[in-house]
Swiss-Prot record:
The keyword DNA-binding applies. Keywords: DNA-binding. It comes from Nanoarchaeum equitans (strain Kin4-M). The lineage of its organism: Archaea, Nanobdellota, Candidatus Nanoarchaeia, Nanoarchaeales, Nanoarchaeaceae. Belongs to the PDCD5 family. The keyword Protease does not apply. Coiled coil: none annotated. This is DNA-binding protein NEQ150.
Length: 97
């Protein structure tokens, strides 16, 4: 690989990251209009602790708000997040011969 190819790849990566960041900002601005201050605070805490989960939660919230544009309070957000990120218990089976 020569220097020019490396630059092109890096430039493409930067463009993709910028597009993703803009989409995330747009989602965030749309969703935040429908959240109470407590729900916003909870979502920001998730953003700091788990950025991947934050992005997923934003996408889900956006879809929910599109279907039923109502104000989402903290308890509703908690319920939604609990369903979204519930831990799955591994099922262990014992097979006896």
């Amino acid at each position: 690989m020569d220097l020019e190819e490396i630059r092109k790849k890096k430039l493409e990566e930067l463009k993709k990251e910028e597009a993703k960041r803009k989409l995330l900002e747009q989602l965030e601005s749309n969703v935040m209009q429908y959240l109470t201050s407590e729900a916003k605070q909870r979502l920001y805490n998730i953003k700091m602790a788990h950025p991947e989960k934050y992005e997923l939660a934003l996408q889900i919230l956006y879809r929910v708000i599109q279907q039923t544009p109502t104000i989402i309070d903290d308890t509703t957000l908690k319920k939604l997040l609990a369903k979204l990120f519930q831990k799955r218990e591994p099922k262990i089976r014992f097979i006896r011969k």
